[in-house]
Structures are given as structure tokens and as C-alpha cells.
Regions:
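Bacterial N-terminal signal peptides
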Residues: 8-19
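Short regulatory alpha-helical segment in sensory/regulatory domains of signaling proteins that mediates
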Residues: 365, 382-383, 396-404, 444, ...
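A residue-level marker of the well-folded mature domains of exported/periplasmic proteins
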Residues: 27-346
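Solvent-exposed, extracytoplasmic
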Residues: 389-403, 480, 484-540, 594-597
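Short N-terminal helix-loop-first-beta-strand/juxtamembrane motif that initiates sensory/input modules
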Residues: 370-376, 398-420, 448-449, 496-517, ...
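Juxtamembrane extracytoplasmic/periplasmic/luminal helical "stalk" adjacent to the first N-terminal
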Residues: 344-388, 398-406, 465-466, 579, ...
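Extracytoplasmic/periplasmic ligand-binding sensor regions of membrane-associated signaling proteins
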Residues: 421-492, 496-497, 551-569
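Extracellular/periplasmic juxtamembrane segments that couple receptor/chemosensory ectodomains to their
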Residues: 533-597
């Protein structure tokens, strides 16, 4: 009897891959173990994630592979899930969604004997327009969503009675922009005067999991005259189907056949056969034929398409279907090339910038609150222990495993001497004296938890230290438990998935002007008030003074546009993140010519 497991990330830390009984002959032939990590929206999203699930379930049934499903909640859980899956005995690790791209690159390089698959991998290009290389044990599954979207765009335009149709996108990102570009081009190709209304639900991953906003935006587009709306918005798309049922108007689904979400009103669905790509990847790995590199699936490969069956063919007149079939043939033959981007220059609103800033601040707060809670528990567990004992090391190992962005975890005696350090690679620093560090002096004085500013650690790298006091069983101060974190690693996992898809710069600055993180990594570690790079820009220096002095606000300045080397006018918004009295200003900036008037 086959057994399948769905693990929470918390359970994963204890044992990421459970042994699953397999009694089929296929298991003996293909005894591989596969860990699949779901994208935002998770299992039962009615689309993208469910399609990946079906592909792996097929491999379980037909090939006898062992499967573990991981459903992270937020960027920190994603990091833990991926790290744990990669370190486990899984032979193949599958990440469902472009948000895993950078981390998959890192892990594939770190674990060359393990195989990795990233669905919707986010291809990076160098300054010459060439694809940046990635590890040979990483398979990047790419879909030409624009081709399937072109076909449903043609169907929508030909079917529309009002001459207006709509597009509802999730996160404003390159992949979703391909859906939009194909849909718009397909509609215009068969009906040049068609009007296409477009709305995106956000600029971060949360945009894929907001049905209420999806409903409101769909209602607005229906109210403005659109009689058909196509969504590429994950769980957010559920809001479209609610609006379609309320208005009794047409909707177009995505990824899988979504006709059940609004029976009789789903004109068609643009299908994306993630299940097939996942199954074939697992099959190749099981057979020893796995190959890395980019693999592209479009109409020709049956990687995308649209639904036309007994349930919806009555909704699509025969002449429309014939025209669309002819278009499909031209795309497959290469006679017709579908655009991947809309030719218009995308603009952001001021509200967009404020919304992104708020979401990023909230994510940083969640991470710091979790670390605070983990350290508090660690200090309680260490009470009455020898701080250099094996039991103390076990506490540190648990703490280190729960927080993947840490450099190390340690215990410190009441004389400021490092006692036990995890991981093993930093053991040589045991016995080091940290009494000269300012945050230690504050801990000694207050006997309360402390979060430091950025400093040069005895272990080498620039870091931030989080100390929690440890007391003996009779309440005497015994020392501390410390987590040394790398701000760059912590913040990149939160910020990069957003900034890589938008024309923005995002950085965190201490109140002394030190850049502890910047999307432009060359600026990390510079002090805005001291570094020569910033001195030719008096508006920037004046704004930096304002940022330091106030917890939130907005302002304008001039500085170099990343990638161009030319100064441009920019708009900035900032808020404050931090803990225990230590404040970081989180700032988002955008060139003014990329902001709506």
C-alpha cells in the first residue's frame, strides 16, 4: 500500500523526508525519492500547484517513486523548506514557481550530486543579453504562456459582444506579463478595435493569494463594460469566478480546466501542462537520464493550449474555433511569432510603491519576531546548563536549523567568552573574547535581549548579533545565547523576488547612514554620509538626513540609474523595521519617469 505525506515546514525541520512504504515492482526499478515544494497559494489552489501535484502523483502511481510535499508559508518557510529538502535524502527536489529560482541556483551548486527542477525558472541575462549559466544539475522548466494566451485572447475578442474584454494578473512579473502580452496580441490580431482592460493585484507574491481583491478588480472591469475576463492570478482568480457568477458574464480560467468554478460561464481555460513537465522530469531522473538546462514547452510541445471539449464547445461557435485552430497551426509552424512583452513601457503608481514597502516591512518584522521567539525559548532551555555542554550544542543546532539566514549560533559566558558555536565550521572561535563589542556591554548593563547594529564579527563577516540573556536555576546571570545573522542573506530572500521584477531599488540603512543591504550589492557596506560615491549628490545627502531623522516619509533626489551609469530623478518612500530599539530604515526608490503622473 502506497502512502503519501504532506508535511508542514515545522515538521520538516525534524525530519524532512519520511520513509514511505512502497510495495510495487516499479519501486524496485526506480527507487528515487522526490521532494516537491509548493508555490504561493499551496496545494488545492485549483491551478498551478495542483497541476504539479498531479504530475508527481502520476509518478508515484506509475513509477513507484516516493513523494513528499512541502507547503511553506512565507519567504522564511520557503528558505527552510528548500534547505531541508536539499540536505535530506531526496534524490530530486522540485520547486514550483519562479520565486524559487535564485535559491535553486544556490542549492544546486552546493549539492552537485542531487538533482533539482524549478518550474517557471526565472532566466537571468548578462549585459550582452546572453543567458547567465546555471548548474548542470538544475533543470529549468519554462513555458511559452504567451502562445496559449494568444489563442484565448483571440477567442475572447471574437466572442465579445461589447468590444471590451479584461485581463486580471496576479503579481506584476515577467511571467504574468507574458500571459498579458499574448492575450492582448491575440485579441488585437482578430479584432484590431477590441479594447482590453488590464489589472494586476499586486507587486509581491501575495498578489497570487488575494481572492477578495481579485473579485473587486473583476467587478470593476465588468462594470466598465468588459464581458469576458481572463485571469492569470492563482488563487486570486477565485474572485473573478465569483464576480462572473454575480454578473452572469464570461470568465477564462488558467493552468488547468477551471470550468467547475463557474459552471456554464467559463468560456475556456488556457492550459499549462505543468503536470506533464513534472512527470517527465521525475521519469528521466528515475531512469538515470536526467539532464539540466533550460527546457521550453509551448504549443508545439503540447506544453500549453486551451480547453475545447464536450462541456464548453457549445460556448465557442464553430467558426471561432476554426479560426483559432488556424492561428494555432501558424504558431506551431513558426509562421507566427507571439510577442512576450507589451510594447508599452510599464509604469508604477505611488500606491504600488507604498504597498510594496508595507509588505516588505511586515515580512522583515515576521522574521525578526520569529528569531526573537526562538532565542527566548533557547535561553529558557539553556537555564541551568553548562553553556559548553553537548546539551547546549543541541539547543544551538535546533536554533540554527530553524533560521536559515544565520551565520552561526553560540553561547557566551558571563565573562564574554564564546563557549559553544554551531555549525562545526566555526568551532575554532570558541574561547574568543567579545567584551569589546558594544552590544555585549549593553546586555551586561540591562540584562535584557539586545539586537546590535552591523559590525565586523570575530568570525569575519559583517553581521548583526541578537543576544538573549541566560540565567541559572537560581536566577543568576550566566551569559547569553546568541544568533549571528547576515543581513544580506536574510534580506535578499525577502526583497530579491520583488525587486528583480520591478524597476525599483530597495535598500536598508542604519540610522548612522550605513547601508546594510541594497539590491545593488556594490552599495552594501557603504556609508551614505562618508563614501565618495554619494558626495556629488547634495539632494541625496539631504534626503538621507531626513530618512535618518524620521521613521517614515517620502522625498525626491538624483542618483545613478542602475545599469545605465546616468543620474536620474528618483522618488523614495521609507518606513522603519527593527527590534529592541535597533532601527533599520527600509527604503524603496523608483525613477520618476517610471511612475504614473
Amino acid at each position: 500500500m502506497k502512502r503519501k505525506w504532506m508535511l508542514s515546514v515545522g515538521m520538516l525541520v525534524v525530519a524532512v523526508v519520511l520513509s514511505i512504504a512502497q510495495d510495487s515492482i516499479a519501486q524496485q526499478l526506480f527507487p528515487i525519492k522526490v521532494a516537491l515544494i509548493f508555490d504561493i497559494g499551496g496545494r488545492e489552489d485549483g491551478g498551478f500547484n495542483d497541476s504539479a501535484y498531479r504530475g508527481l502523483e502520476r509518478a508515484v502511481s506509475e513509477l513507484g517513486v516516493k513523494a513528499v510535499y512541502l507547503e511553506p508559508d512565507g519567504s522564511l518557510d520557503r528558505e527552510i523548506a528548500l534547505n531541508s529538502a536539499a540536505a535530506s535524502d531526496a534524490d530530486l527536489v522540485i520547486g514550483v514557481g519562479f520565486i524559487f529560482s535564485d535559491k535553486m541556483n544556490e542549492l544546486a551548486a552546493r549539492y552537485p550530486a542531487k538533482k533539482f527542477v524549478c518550474v517557471d525558472y526565472n532566466i537571468r541575462y548578462d549585459n550582452q543579453g546572453q543567458i547567465k549559466p546555471f548548474p548542470g544539475n538544475l533543470s529549468a522548466l519554462l513555458f511559452r504562456e504567451e502562445e496559449g494566451s494568444y489563442l484565448v485572447g483571440a477567442i475572447a475578442a471574437l466572442k465579445s459582444r461589447t468590444g471590451k474584454i479584461g485581463f486580471l494578473g496576479g503579481m506584476d512579473s515577467p511571467i504574468i506579463l507574458r500571459f498579458q502580452a499574448g492575450y492582448l496580441a491575440g485579441a488585437k490580431s482578430v479584432r484590431p478595435d477590441i479594447r482590453v482592460l488590464s489589472q494586476f493585484t499586486g507587486l509581491t507574491g501575495k498578489a497570487f493569494n488575494n481572492p477578495q481583491k481579485g473579485y473587486l478588480l473583476a467587478e470593476r472591469m465588468y462594470g466598465e463594460g468588459a464581458d469576458i475576463i481572463f485571469h492569470a492570478a492563482g488563487v486570486t482568480g477565485e474572485g473573478l469566478f465569483l464576480a462572473a457568477k454575480k454578473r452572469h458574464l464570461w470568465a477564462i480560467g488558467v493552468d488547468i480546466d477551471q470550468s467547475s468554478l463557474a459552471p456554464g460561464l467559463v468560456l475556456t481555460s488556457m492550459t499549462k501542462h505543468v503536470d506533464v513537465a513534472v512527470f517527465e522530469s521525475v521519469k528521466a531522473c528515475a531512469a538515470g537520464n536526467f539532464s539540466g538546462g533550460a527546457k521550453s514547452f509551448g504549443l508545439k510541445e503540447n506544453g500549453v493550449g486551451f480547453v475545447y471539449d464536450d462541456y464548453n464547445k457549445g460556448l465557442i461557435p464553430g467558426d471561432i474555433h476554426d479560426k483559432v485552430q488556424a492561428i494555432q497551426g501558424k504558431i506551431i509552424s513558426g509562421e507566427l511569432t507571439v510577442p512576450t512583452v507589451d510594447s508599452s513601457k510599464p509604469l508604477l503608481s505611488r500606491n504600488d510603491l507604498r504597498d510594496v514597502l508595507t509588505e516588505l516591512k511586515d515580512e522583515i518584522k515576521v522574521v525578526l519576531e520569529k528569531l526573537d521567539s526562538d532565542l527566548k525559548l533557547g535561553a529558557k532551555m539553556l537555564s541551568g546548563m553548562e553553556l559548553n555542554s553537548d546539551r547546549a550544542r543541541s539547543v544551538l543546532k535546533r536554533l540554527y536549523g530553524l533560521n536559515p539566514y544565520l551565520i552561526d549560533c553560540s553561547t557566551v559566558s558571563n565573562q564574554a567568552i564564546l563557549q559553544a558555536i554551531v555549525p562545526e565550521g566555526f568551532k575554532q572561535f570558541e574561547g574568543a573574547d567579545i567584551s569589546a563589542q558594544a552590544h555585549w556591554a549593553k546586555l551586561i548593563k540591562t540584562r535584557k535581549p539586545v539586537l546590535s547594529g552591523s559590525f565586523r564579527s570575530v568570525q569575519g563577516p559583517a553581521a548583526v548579533a541578537f543576544h538573549y540573556p541566560v540565567f541559572s536555576s537560581d536566577s543568576r546571570f550566566a551569559g547569553s545565547v546568541s544568533a549571528l545573522l547576515a543581513p544580506e542573506k536574510l534580506l535578499a530572500g525577502i526583497i530579491t523576488p520583488v525587486s528583480s521584477n520591478l524597476p525599483v531599488d530597495i535598500f536598508l540603512m542604519q540610522t548612522d547612514g550605513l547601508m546594510i543591504y541594497d539590491v545593488d550589492t556594490d552599495q552594501i557596506g557603504r556609508n551614505v554620509f562618508q563614501d565618495p560615491l554619494y558626495q556629488p549628490f547634495p539632494e541625496l545627502l539631504a534626503l538621507a538626513q531626513k530618512v535618518v531623522a524620521t521613521k517614515k516619509g517620502t522625498g525626491e533626489y538624483r542618483f545613478y540609474q542602475e545599469g545605465s551609469g546616468e543620474p536620474v530623478s528618483k522618488l523614495a518612500y521609507w518606513k522603519t523595521a527593527g527590534k529592541l530599539g535597533t532601527e533599520w530604515r527600509i527604503v524603496i526608490t523608483c525613477a520618476k519617469d517610471r511612475i504614473e503622473k
